[in-house]
Amino acid sequence: SRLSKPLMETLAVIAYRQPVTVNEIETVRGVGADHSVRALVERRLVEEKGRKQTPGRPVLYGTTDEFLHRFGMNGLADLPPENLFSPVPARVPSEP
């Protein structure tokens, strides 16, 4: 099944910044990520990779072999350069 935009955004953050915590994902995206991470784990695209050695020992997430297979990659080195995904303004200001 296709992934929604929030799931794709969360998956991209995990793919490029792994291992990463939910809090770190939320910092990058600016919105809650618990639901998205849970959905990606259920789809076997993301899995727990351990725990961060900080207070609270939050779970670290990373991509799976299923992620690589589904997106036609042999490894994370096959990811396109992250700078291809620069933010695009929601609207272009009109010229005076």
Segments from the language model and where they lie:
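Short alpha-helical segments that sit at the start of domains
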Residues: 1-8, 42
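Minor-groove-contacting beta-hairpin "wing" of winged helix-turn-helix DNA-binding domains
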Residues: 53-64
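Phosphate-centric recognition/catalysis
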Residues: 69-96
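Short amphipathic alpha-helical elements of helix-turn-helix/winged-helix folds
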Residues: 10-17, 70
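A short, conserved structural fragment
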Residues: 44-53
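Short acidic, hydrophobic short linear motifs in intrinsically disordered regions
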Residues: 17-28
